[in-house]
């Protein structure tokens, strides 16, 4: 049996809501419904009664619940033990490409410079979309996630690392937003919710990317503009803020599992400043 089906069943039984379960699992609601149907087909029974705003476990669902909890607990314990033997000196850090390029690359260098207390530790810098990294974190395939969004699941611990400033940059001075093509650099779903009000509701991105380096290199060729961290843009040089734009403050969080066996190590590593400019 696919453990992902059991995990989805447990989340729906906990939230009693397909939409909230989908949000917690970082899935679409249709994906959650499909997984539940798969599990019901495998077992040959209905697990939930479905009425609008009223999802309840059936008698079969109630019987499955303790077994599902035990199976998932055993599976997680097994994964933890196996992972511990193979990753004793490894420490994986996940983030988007833009975060690695603009700030975490420097932090990784500081971690190596301050490694006396953790000699022999092998770091893995993992680049992926946030949704994929959250899943890896939940499944103990990732030790630490650095992101611009606070965690949404109770089993995660988090620490606010500070804030960084974004500004709208282009390659030439004295440019207005209306004169430029927009390049969308992904800074998280919550950033995109406010994006239309910042660049114009009808503005369609000419390019979308998760890489700050790529976006910065394309600005001049595409007569474009994009949101970049101010401190990083100043170091790069050759970039100019768009005249009729504003600046934005973005938070940076470290997220890890509450019951991680590397809790002490994580807190020690986070004592080394992640951001060059913390405020």
From Swiss-Prot:
InterPro entries: LTTR (IPR050176), LysR_subst-bd (IPR005119), Tscrpt_reg_HTH_HdfR (IPR020890), Tscrpt_reg_HTH_LysR (IPR000847), WH-like_DNA-bd_sf (IPR036388), WH_DNA-bd_sf (IPR036390)
HTH lysR-type domain location: 1-58
Record-linked SUPFAM superfamilies: Periplasmic binding protein-like II, Winged helix' DNA-binding domain
Residue ranges flagged as DNA-binding region: 18-37
Keywords annotated in UniProt: DNA-binding, Repressor, Transcription, Transcription regulation
UniProt-listed GO biological process terms: negative regulation of DNA-templated transcription
One GO molecular-function entry: DNA binding
UniProt superkingdom: Bacteria
Function noted in UniProt: Negatively regulates the transcription of the flagellar master operon flhDC by binding to the upstream region of the operon.
Family per record: Belongs to the LysR transcriptional regulatory family.
Protein name: HTH-type transcriptional regulator HdfR
Species of provenance: Escherichia coli O139:H28 (strain E24377A / ETEC)
